[in-house]
Amino acid sequence: MTNKCLLQIALLLCFSTTALSMSYNLLGFLQRSSSFQCQKLLWQLNGRLEYCLKDRMNFDIPEEIKQPQQFQKEDAALTIYEMLQNIYAIFRQDLSSTGWNETIVENLLANVYHQIDHLKTILEEKLEKEDFTRGKFVSSLHLKRYYGRILHYLKAKEYSHCAWTIVRVEILRNFFFINKLTGYLRN
C-alpha cells in the first residue's frame, strides 16, 4: 500500500515538474526573482560612480531592448537568454583591479548561470514541441555588437576600476530591461 502511494506521488511530482517547466508563467516568476537577486548582488559591489564620470560611455543598447514592441514569449525568452550569456561572459573577464568581493561575484555568476540553464531547458522543450520561427527576436548581431562594445571598452581601459564601475552600472540597466522583457513571458 505504501509503495503504491509513493509511486503515485513520485509520478505526480514528475508530471508536475514537466508541466511546470513548460509554463512561461513559472519561467517569468523565476526570471524576475533571479534578476532581482542579480541586481542586489551588483549593488553590493563597491565602486563610486561619481569618481568615474569622466569614463562614462554610451554603449548604445539596441533599441529593440529599450522599447520592445509586442514580443512573443519565445522571442523574449531567447533575447533574455542571449543577454544573460553575454553578461556571464563579461563577468568572467579580468576583475583584479576592482577590489570586489569575490564571493559576491561568484554568487552573481552562479545566479546568472542558473538563469541561463533554466532558460535553455525551457527553450529546448518549447522548440522541440513547436514549429518555432523567430518573430521580433532582437537580432543576435545587434546584441553581439552591443556586448562587443562593452568588452572592447573594458579592454581599452585595461580593466580599470572605473571601467568596471561604468560596466557594472550598464549591466544593472540590462537587468532593468531583462525585467521588462520578462513581462512578455506570461501565458
Swiss-Prot record:
Signal peptide: 1-21
GO molecular-function term, one example from the UniProt record: cytokine activity
Alphabetic keyword roster: Antiviral defense, Cytokine, Disulfide bond, Glycoprotein, Phosphoprotein, Secreted, Signal
Compartment annotation: Secreted
Cellular component per GO, a single term: extracellular space
Alphabetized InterPro entries for the sequence: 4_helix_cytokine-like_core (IPR009079), Interferon_alpha/beta/delta (IPR000471)
Residues modified by glycosylation: 101
Highest taxon in the source lineage: Eukaryota
Disulfide bonds listed in the record: 52-162
Family, similarity comment: Belongs to the alpha/beta interferon family.
Its biological purpose: Type I interferon cytokine that plays a key role in the innate immune response to infection, developing tumors and other inflammatory stimuli. Signals via binding to high-affinity (IFNAR2) and low-affinity (IFNAR1) heterodimeric receptor, activating the canonical Jak-STAT signaling pathway resulting in transcriptional activation or repression of interferon-regulated genes that encode the effectors of the interferon response, such as antiviral proteins, regulators of cell proliferation and differentiation, and immunoregulatory proteins.
Complex formation: Monomer.
Protein's recorded name: Interferon beta
Organism: Macaca fascicularis
Lineage summary: Eukaryota, Metazoa, Chordata, Craniata, Vertebrata
Protein's gene: IFNB1
